[in-house]
Amino acid sequence: MSIRFIIGRAGAGKTRACLEAIRKELLARPYGPPLILLVPEQATFQIEYALAATPGLSGFIRARVLSFRRLAYRVLREVGGAARAHIGELGKRMVLRRLLEQRRSELRVLGRSSGRPGFADTLARTLGEMKTYCIGPDELARAAFDLREKGGAALLADKLEDLAKLCFDLEDYLAGRFTDPDDYLNLLADCLELSAEVRGTEVWVDGFSGFTPQEYRVLAALARTASRVNITLCADPAALSGKIDETSLFFPVRETYDRLLKMALQERIPLERPLILGGNTARFKSPAISHLEKYFFVRPAPPCLNCSEGVVLAAAANPKAEAEGVAREITALCRDRGYRYRDIVILLRDVDSYAGLISSIFADHGIPVFIDQKRPVMHHPMVELVRSALEAVTEDWAFDPVFRYLKTDLVPLSREEVDLLENYVLAHGIRGSRWTDGRPWEYRRELTLEEDPGLNGSESVELEKVNRIRHQATADLLEFCRSFMQAKNVREMSTALFNLLTGLKVPEQLESWSRQAEKEGRLEAAREHSLVWSGFTALLDQVVEALGDEVLEPGEYAAVIDAGLESLRLGLIPPGLDQVLVASLERSRNPEMRAAFVMGVNDGVLPARTFDQGIFSDLERERLKAAGLELAPGGRRKFFEEQYLVYIALTRSSERIYLSYPLADGEGRALMPSPIVARVKELLPDVEERVWPVEPNAALLDDLEFVTGPRRTLSYLASQMREFKAGRRIDPLWWDVYSWFAAGEMREHCKRVLSGLFHSNREDRLPPAVSMALYGRPLRASVSGLEKFRACPFAHFLSYGLKLKERAIFKLDAPDLGRFFHAALKLFGDRVREQGLDWGQLDREQCQEMAGEVVDLLAPRLSSEILLSTARRRYLTGKLRRTVQRAALVLAEHSRRSKFRPVGLELSFGPDGDLPAPVFTLADGSEMAVSGRIDRIEAAPSDEGVYLRIIDFKSGKVTVKLTDIYHGLKLQLLAYLDVALEHARTLTGGNGLPGAVLYFRIDDPLVNTDGPVPPGEEVEREILKKLRMTGLVLADPKAVRLMDAGLDGISDLIPVQIKADGSFAARSAVLTREQFALLRSYLRFQLASAGSEIIGGTVEIAPYRKGRYRSCQSCPFRPVCQFDLLVDGNVYRSIKDEDEGAIWSKLGRMCRKGWGQ
């Protein structure tokens, strides 16, 4: 037994010396005693591959490349101790959560933090650290007692006592039941000398800068058992003797060396003469890299003149541009310099911040890459299936979890069937017992509030299909729900969850996905599909082992599983042999790399400045060390250890190293380069500096550098063609690139990509045959549809031509409320008529009583009983009742003060309507029939005939402007008036005269007051003012007084003000009889003109802008039309409020010319 040190700086050939010694043994004696190479866990695959690639060595059985943990497993399996079930990290965290909950009231410090997210993980790491540093509960309790005796550290003593209690509890829980993985190395140290496999073997220990107390115990046992233990130390041999400063680069290694010497002395293990590897010729072929290795941490240091070959500093605009630059450089190295992808490594201080960018960008460049990090699984469909199934049964079958479950592609339904079911459930607000009661669904979304006429044939077929899909979708989930909710403990809950997955044949589906991914060359995805099932079953095993007999609420169990899945990571090995390796600086132990890219060399990132302190602060760690309890280094010590990571970064490659840094983060915030950059410039004054632009830029980089993989080059080509199209000069190289694509296999793809350069987002006219098929002849149109056409022809085409609709959602929106108010006021009016009452004679009590009856009758009919579905919506029913009561009161007040009485309520016109449809002859000679529904027509007799006024109910504030009528945006009131006047004799028996077109606002407004609450009459008067109708009124005092008999000054009812001399004030919205006639004539022209354009195929994307309003604001079709002001051809039609006199002049001229004849 003996120990030999192999000492040398980075690049001196320590790993090579270990591998060569093992290779020599394997070639000399293939069947001799075992040879063990101990390396960090993350390096096992790379080192084993390097060993297997030995020329002349077709295979080996003697050599073992192991980590400490894997060595423990092998030895315990040999000598005993591996049979007892082990509790994994996830299981231990679950146990700790339970123990924390039970002990919370007794814990002085940790109890206050026990409910904080992630605290159980922090606690588990701290207890693991205690085990690693061989500190048990007795030592913790003793240290707490000593600190209290000395005084001044009460908080630290409380922490130690809390940890001691939890440590005792954890050990009691695990005793005789489980093996804690944190105890593996202690168990290994205790029984290593019993192992026949290790006894007499030679061991090499490589790649470690330091060891934990547990690992020191294992090394001592190895030294006693093996024939020789070779330990490599990465340090300058001179640093291992004499005094050395704590801030020195090799101080941590010196501490390790001193401790190993002390261990050998205590164990009486002989020390062999160390193997000192001097010089840098073993690895570095670049003098510049060799100079950095030797002098980077030496001050003062001589600069290396004219020897910067192999070192590049690169700045990029942001991390994306940086990743693009790295991809281009890698392509150039492999294409022009004969590198293989496996010769290249990308080193990162924080892999997570770059992993996504590198994956997507390298795929575009066609560069195979392996990112050395354990993959989270939360994105995987199987994990989503588990989480959503648990969430569905614990959250009363809410919409989101149920359909997340169904959309995993692991439930036996097609996506089309899931979509159909989703639309139905969204439309009817189905959740809870309506999923589980077994009764067939027969909900329908009613478009009216009339009596239910029953199911028609197509509705019956659709409901039958929906119910069939529902049964197929929920059969397994219902069975899981039943067994899960009846489970008596965690074991039975886990069994129910496992049965759900096996019932759905999830393992078989994952295997199928894995095979398919492998066929498509997606090797990492294939491996991930294979591992996720074993990872999940291992998690379930740990849950059962740790909490099997515990009784948890369903929500608590779901939280345990969710936490376990969130911390579950899949460790993948490189699926290919020729890939770029992406690794963390802390995990990088890769031999023989020719080129290294160190990304993210920014201030505060490399070297890092902030560290997770865990439960103990740096000061507390120092106090514990003084008290004899040594823990892992604190933040201060870690900051010095960052120097060693910088040293690793600078010395990983033999030929080339690229240090790159973004100048801003992804959100544009400025970033500074790391001090490393300035230091490299000091040592290498001639170092090559580059700027990696986002797009080709000849001033910064040769355009040829951007010609990489076909996919990425094509996107660069598109950007250059855009520059050329804009009139700017581009490098002739891009025409050669274009020719290559145009003549090759990717010409169709190239054509599609470049077609976007000429995209104008314009719509051509529809061919006559298409227009005929969509709209038919005669054209049937509604007034609101023609208004929509004037607002935007394309929106009209989508809505009335293609009949696109937003999918129905179970919610109470403005159209629903509008339908409700219209139906309520019609029913109210019908009851007034049926009971022989006059609107003007209705008192407050009658209005309130009748309105309440009407609302109670209609509420269950609205959108599948939506008003009865929740307490909030039932409260809303009361608000609707008050609003309808207020509308009835205001209408009654109108009747008391006017001579106008209703002659039509919710009166329809058009085919099958109450009144015939107005028919217009269009430009091509065909006809258009216009339909609509008039909310309320009122009439008042006069000497000249019968005045008619149109009232349109609105739940919001609406006004009428002549500009809107002129541009065809608001035609409904005039169209309704025109229809009423055309059929006045049918409605009234007399000659119809235009009286007014008005909007009636349905609301129950609040009255603001600065002082005491005013009397009731004053409040009612203020409410009347707030609900004053808007619109246009005949400029005839007689007609006006028929609408407001007591009018004196400003009317509370209509938009009119009469001055003292009897004339109308300027603020009055009045029109003469001639103006009404002119507008009626213009209305017919507008409707016929719009109809002619529709059948002529006009579908242009032409929304309008008026002031701050854009017609796109409330349009549901924006994702379809993709209107964008930045795209050629997309511009708003600007509509301005013109002077009314100017508009009347235009209308007069148009009328005299025959409306455009």
Curated annotation (Swiss-Prot):
One of its GO terms (molecular function) is metal ion binding. Residues 1-299 form the UvrD-like helicase ATP-binding domain. Its EC number is 3.1.-.-. Residues 279-590 form the UvrD-like helicase C-terminal domain. ATP binds at G8, R9, A10, G11, A12, G13, K14, T15. Keywords: 4Fe-4S, ATP-binding, DNA damage, DNA repair, DNA-binding, Exonuclease, Helicase, Hydrolase, Iron, Iron-sulfur, Metal-binding, Nuclease, Nucleotide-binding. It holds the Pfam family PDDEXK_1. It is an enzyme of class 3 (hydrolase). The keyword Hydrolase applies. Binds 1 [4Fe-4S] cluster. InterPro entries: ADDB_N, DNA_helicase_suAddB, DNA_helicase_UvrD-like_C, P-loop_NTPase, PDDEXK-like_dom_sf, PDDEXK_AddAB-type. The keyword GTP-binding does not apply. [4Fe-4S] cluster binds at C792, C1112, C1115, C1121. Its cofactor is Mg(2+); [4Fe-4S] cluster. One of its GO terms (biological process) is double-strand break repair via homologous recombination. Despite having conserved helicase domains, this subunit does not have helicase activity. The heterodimer acts as both an ATP-dependent DNA helicase and an ATP-dependent, dual-direction single-stranded exonuclease. Recognizes the chi site generating a DNA molecule suitable for the initiation of homologous recombination. The AddB subunit has 5' -> 3' nuclease activity but not helicase activity. HAMAP family: AddB_type1 (MF_01452). Heterodimer of AddA and AddB. Belongs to the helicase family. AddB/RexB type 1 subfamily. This is ATP-dependent helicase/deoxyribonuclease subunit B.
